Amino acid sequence: MSLVPKNFSRDFLSQSALTLRSCSDSESADRLRTFCTAISVAPKFYLDHEISIGETLDTEFRTKTNALFNKDAINLPFRTFVIEPTLVGKKGVRPSIFEYFGYDDQSIVISVAIKNLITNQWDIVLSGACVTKDGYQVERSDVSKLKQKFPDGYLLSVVRVACSLLYDITAMLECSNVKVETLPSRPLNKSAAKRGALPFDTYHILTIEPRANSSSTKA
């Protein structure tokens, strides 16, 4: 089956446009615009066919992740970082965190935390996945705690959002104009946890640099 180009950044750019129109923080808006500009011109990943997450989450999710990468073309230059896009949906703004833990030279473990709009706390939606040079393979997808707390319809919608953005961001990891930068650690205390604070002690951000033939400034 021949490969066809897939624009992974389209939905993210559309959601970001809504965020920018309502954003009162000029510095945050500028950072988001810079990121959107970078991903709009970044190299796009390739899929051999379209796949979508269906009602049978485990089967469809595994099918999609296994088919996500062309194993001969995969190139993941970074080992650990966190990115914070903002989603605008029917219930308002939903911040999401994507954390990539690298543990050797050939693979990256991925964990996604998404903010629960009902409890205002952070839930680990996909507790583990592994990207290797041989392709993409799910090691563990633990949503049992969410299933105990929320109806199936709500759970499925949250997982769909997390999976969709996970694919978008992972697909952009091979872009040569994206670099990783570590932020100072921040201790997490009980009062911060009650406010829905981020569940990580150390944060990482993406620093986007212009292409060699671009006149843009560094973010």
Residue ranges and their predicted role:
Residues 214-219:
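C-terminal, beta-strand-rich globular interaction domains
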